[in-house]
């Protein structure tokens, strides 16, 4: 076996192994995009409610994952069977996917400020209309979950809940906040929380009934609640995840660029090897 044949054989199996890896990676990308679309319990869904293009990007991410899996399968078969038509198709579609992912990464990075502004607008609107419409609770439950996970209360501070008319105690000027603001680690006393929870619900009136999730209730502002707003934590979360998404897009793009180079090299040199083998027969 000549050096060129050994090199082509090495490239062939290299493409096969790494396309197998990218098949698994494409499955993970698809699952991540699908999770953003269907998950209604995390603050990722709250971000999606605030910025419609995020839902579009999630769908693009899911489709991108499916395309990555299909291309990886195409590359595996084309490299292993040494089929020029499949390798050429693999190169062309990989080039298209490369351009799409780079464009997606640039769009996400340039829309960060707009996304943060839209999130802030939705948060303040959700706080102001808290519990006013029992039929529309998706944003409220998502924000309760965000406060619980980020260990914060309100947007800038718990005083933001002054704007929520339904959480003001009847006949009292005392401020009430959702129980997602309650800092249970400050007291380590769940029994005190239960007593507080039951007594305050009765003061909020008939519309303050407990929903299906246990995260919805009310607490007086003097209780042990988180004193920091969620603005900084949520903006930091958005910033870190946007950087991660852009980094993944660029990293995968560079790998795809390398695979395109190897596939076109293998595709162009297969005929030369076969012609030489035919002369030796």
From Swiss-Prot:
Domain of life where this protein originates: Eukaryota
Glycosylation sites: 170, 183, 188
Annotated localization: Cell membrane
Modification comment: Tyrosine phosphorylated; leading to activation of downstream signaling pathways.
Known function: Structural component of specialized membrane microdomains known as tetraspanin-enriched microdomains (TERMs), which act as platforms for receptor clustering and signaling. Participates thereby in diverse biological functions such as cell signal transduction, adhesion, migration and protein trafficking. Upon ligand binding, two signaling pathways are activated, one acting through phosphorylation by LYN leading to cell death or a survival pathway with activation of GSK3B.
Family: Belongs to the tetraspanin (TM4SF) family.
Name recorded for this polypeptide: Leukocyte antigen CD37
Organism: Rattus norvegicus (Rat)
Gene label: Cd37
């Amino acid at each position: 076996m000549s050096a060129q044949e050994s090199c082509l054989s090495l490239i062939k199996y290299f493409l096969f192994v790494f396309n197998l890896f990218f098949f698994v990676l494409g499955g993970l990308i698809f699952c991540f995009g699908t999770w953003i679309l269907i998950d209604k319990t995390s603050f990722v869904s709250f971000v999606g409610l605030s910025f419609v293009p995020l839902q579009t990007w999630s769908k693009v991410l899911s489709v991108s994952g499916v395309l990555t899996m299909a291309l990886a399968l195409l590359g595996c078969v084309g490299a292993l069977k040494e089929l020029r038509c499949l390798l050429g198709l693999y190169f062309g579609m990989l080039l298209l996917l490369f351009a799409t992912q780079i464009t997606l990464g640039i769009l996400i990075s340039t829309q960060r400020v707009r996304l943060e502004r839209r999130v802030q607008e939705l948060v303040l609107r959700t706080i102001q209309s808290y519990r006013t419409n029992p039929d529309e609770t998706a944003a409220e439950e998502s924000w309760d979950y965000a406060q619980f996970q980020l260990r914060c209360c309100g947007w800038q501070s718990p005083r933001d809940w002054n704007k929520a008319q339904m959480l003001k105690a009847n006949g009292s000027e005392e401020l009430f906040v959702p129980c997602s603001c309650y800092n249970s680690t400050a007291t380590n006393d769940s029994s005190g929380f239960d007593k507080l929870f039951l007594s305050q619900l009765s003061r909020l009136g008939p519309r303050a009934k407990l929903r299906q999730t246990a995260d919805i209730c009310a607490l007086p502002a003097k209780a042990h609640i988180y004193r920091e707003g969620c603005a900084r934590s949520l903006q930091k979360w958005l910033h870190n995840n946007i950087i991660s998404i852009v980094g993944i897009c660029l990293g995968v793009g560079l790998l795809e660029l390398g695979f395109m180079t190897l596939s076109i090299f293998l595709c162009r040199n297969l005929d030369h090897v076969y012609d030489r083998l035919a002369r030796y027969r």
